[in-house]
Every structure is written in C-alpha cells, then in structure tokens.
C-alpha cells in the first residue's frame, strides 16, 4: 500500500476525515511518528496525550486544547481509545472538565458534555503495556453519534451528577455515581484547587473534576460497531 501522508490543513468533509483515519489503520505508532519526524517516547508516563497529538497531526486537527471540537468546522471530536487484544477499552475516556460553579440555567442540550459527544471519531489503539509504545498498532476508526438510547442514558447520568454539584455535594461524588458517565478529580497534583459550591451554599476549594465515559459504555459502543464478542 502507498505510504499515507498527513493532512496539512483541516479536513473539509467527514468523508475526507474518515478516509484519512482509515489509511492509518494497521500502522504502528512508531511508524506514524517517524513519518512526521516525531520521536516516540518510551512510555506515556510523562506524555499522556502523546498518541492524541500524533493522530491530530495526521488528521489535520485544528482545536488543540481549545473548548471547541478537534475538527471544529465539521463538529467532530477525536477520541483515541486504548484497547486490549480483544478490542475492549482498557480505561475510561475523558470528555471535558466539569463546571463546578455558574451552572444556573445549564441544560443537557446546551452542556459541554453533549457538545463534545455529539459527533466523535473513535480511533482504537493497542494499549496493553506488554507491547512497547512504538509497536502498538492503530485500529479501524469509527465515526459515531449517540443514538436515542445512548443520549438518554448520558443525559440521566449528567443530570444526576450536575444536581449533586449544584446542591453542594461535589465532595460526595464518587466514580460509582452515574451508570455510563462519571465525574472524577482531574489534576496533576493535589495543590491545583478550584472553586465549588459547598453543602451550605458557601464557596469552597476542591480538586478540579472531569467528566469521563465509563468502560461499560465505550465497550458496548465498540462491540456493537465492530461486532466484537
């Protein structure tokens, strides 16, 4: 097969984006990195977002870490997902930072979570630690939007979690709350505190939180589309 080339500007259509992603399928991260002059780190301990950055280069992504989607003109978000040898997700998937203040009037329809999950390009990548990072292969991409049932499930979880935040119960939220969507602390160190609402309506300082998709949600999603048993 002819060697793929990175997109030098953002893709103009979903078809172009998907076609480019399909070209990467089967290549190792080391091969893709070498083709664009990147050095593959030994592991992801200090470079947690490295795989995402590499694929953004190949796919012509535009957003960086800005709040809009990675492919803003198309309204598509890129999510890499580490999978085991059976194609099952190995970890939860970060969606966006959870807003802990200023939430009056926010609805599911206008929420950042729904905005980020409206249209997602999922790219599975081999993630088992026994495989050296440079030798991990990129899998077949999937362009996905939540169906009615998935949207309902995510909405219910989001509403439950946001109610707890608004009612000053952020410190009581655990990873077990929510069936498919969870909230967890998201901070590189325990000193990075942010404002939130306390139990009596007062301002408190707490760790920043992030919304994550649980593995049971992404596992069912991948299994349904790739017919994994």
From Swiss-Prot:
Effect of residue 64 to R: In strain: ECOR 50
Gene3D superfamilies: DNA mismatch repair MutH/Restriction endonuclease, type II
UniProt keywords, alphabetically: Cytoplasm, DNA damage, DNA repair, Endonuclease, Hydrolase, Nuclease
CDD domains: MutH-like
Effect of residue 60 to C: In strain: ECOR 13, ECOR 20, ECOR 26 and ECOR 70
Alphabetical GO biological process terms: DNA modification; mismatch repair; regulation of DNA recombination
Pfam families named in the record: MutH
Cellular component terms per the entry's GO annotation: cytoplasm; mismatch repair complex
InterPro entries in the cross-refs: DNA_mismatch_repair_MutH, DNA_rep_MutH/RE_typeII_Sau3AI, DNA_rep_MutH/T2_RE_sf, Restrct_endonuc-II-like
Subcellular location: Cytoplasm
Effect of residue 58 to S: In strain: ECOR 67
Domain of life: Bacteria
Consequence of changing residue 153 to R: In strain: ECOR 67
Gene Ontology MF annotations: DNA binding; endonuclease activity; T/G mismatch-specific endonuclease activity
NCBIfam families: mutH_TIGR, PRK05070.1
Function, as annotated: Sequence-specific endonuclease that cleaves unmethylated GATC sequences. It is involved in DNA mismatch repair.
Family of the protein in this entry: Belongs to the MutH family.
Entry protein name: DNA mismatch repair protein MutH
Species in which this protein is naturally found: Escherichia coli (strain K12)
């Amino acid at each position: 097969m002819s060697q793929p080339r990175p997109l030098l500007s953002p893709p103009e259509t979903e078809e172009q984006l998907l076609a480019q992603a399909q070209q990467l399928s089967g290549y190792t991260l080391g091969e893709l990195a070498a083709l664009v002059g990147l050095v593959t780190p030994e592991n992801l301990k200090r470079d947690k977002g490295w795989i995402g950055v590499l694929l953004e280069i190949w796919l012509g992504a535009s957003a960086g870490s800005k709040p809009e989607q990675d492919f803003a003109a198309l309204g598509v978000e890129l999510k890499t997902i580490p999978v085991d040898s059976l194609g099952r997700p190995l970890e939860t998937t970060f969606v966006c930072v959870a807003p802990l203040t200023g939430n009056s009037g926010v609805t599911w329809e206008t929420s950042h979570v729904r905005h980020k999950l409206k249209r997602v390009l999922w790219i599975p990548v081999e993630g088992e630690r026994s495989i050296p990072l440079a030798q991990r292969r990129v899998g077949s991409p999937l362009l996905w939007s939540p169906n009615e049932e998935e949207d309902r499930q995510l909405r219910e979880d989001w509403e439950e979690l946001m109610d707890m935040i608004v009612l000053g119960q952020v410190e009581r939220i655990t990873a077990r709350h929510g069936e498919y969507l969870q909230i967890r602390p998201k901070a590189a160190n325990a000193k990075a505190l942010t404002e939130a609402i306390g139990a009596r309506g007062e301002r408190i300082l707490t760790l920043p939180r992030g919304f994550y998709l649980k593995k049971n949600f992404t596992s069912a999603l991948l299994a349904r589309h790739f017919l994994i048993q």
